[in-house]
Amino acid sequence: MSKTPYSGMGAIVGPEGVTFRVWAPHAEKVFITGSFNDWDDNIDEMEHEDDGYWAFHHPNAKVNDEYKFAIQTPTGRIQKSDPYALKMTHSNGNSVVFDLYEGYETHDYEMPSMNKLVIYELHVGTFNREGLEENQVGNFYKAAEKLDYLKSLGINAVEIMPVMEFPGDHSWGYNPSFPFSVEGSYGGPEGLRHFVFESHIRGIAVIMDVVYNHFGPDDLDLWQFDGWQ
């Protein structure tokens, strides 16, 4: 490890590279592999920290690099995506380094009091499909195009149905695969950030419907993550 790692979990972006950290208490060894090291899963061995955590700071890793963890278990080596990934190529693909603060625009916004909220429940995939192909789902950018319409109805808050990464493109969102990653077909974390910004400048609050108590039946890369039996 070339430098003191940054604090946090997942892929933490800093001025001198990216720190990767994962909790894998049953692993014998963990390596980080990705586009920054030509997907070689034998050269960048992560340091075993306390309480089952593993970390590695890679000075050459950057935003939009893809990566996985190569976990050595008693029965062999397995490759797993990052449970804390903020972005995925797809629900059964690679994790992607994402910087929450890059391109972030600040603005003044204050949510109305609870007793004054007029909430519209919104499904991103079907709310606005105007101009899209028959089987193409809507996304955050298309949804943002109709925010003025919602405002004209007196709506001052939208509750978006779950947008955590799920298998396929068509879903209500209650079958998540990665709890911190934003569904790619909806526009990923960049799309969500755009939607929130456009909502706030119109005085519309954004409420997230989240699913943390269960996962879906497919693309369960987190199952037996570090080889536990």
Q: Which role fits each region the language model picked out?
A:
Residues 1-19, 44, 48-121, 126-135, ...:
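The feature marks proteins involved in alpha-glucan
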Residues 22, 34, 58, 71, ...:
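Glycine-rich, histidine-containing beta strand-loop boundary motifs that form or position
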Residues 23-30:
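Short proline/glycine-enriched turn/loop motifs at strand-loop junctions of beta-rich domains
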Residues 30-32, 67:
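Short beta-strand elements bearing conserved aromatic residues within extracellular beta-rich modules
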Residues 111-114, 123-229:
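Substrate-binding/active-site clefts of carbohydrate-active enzymes
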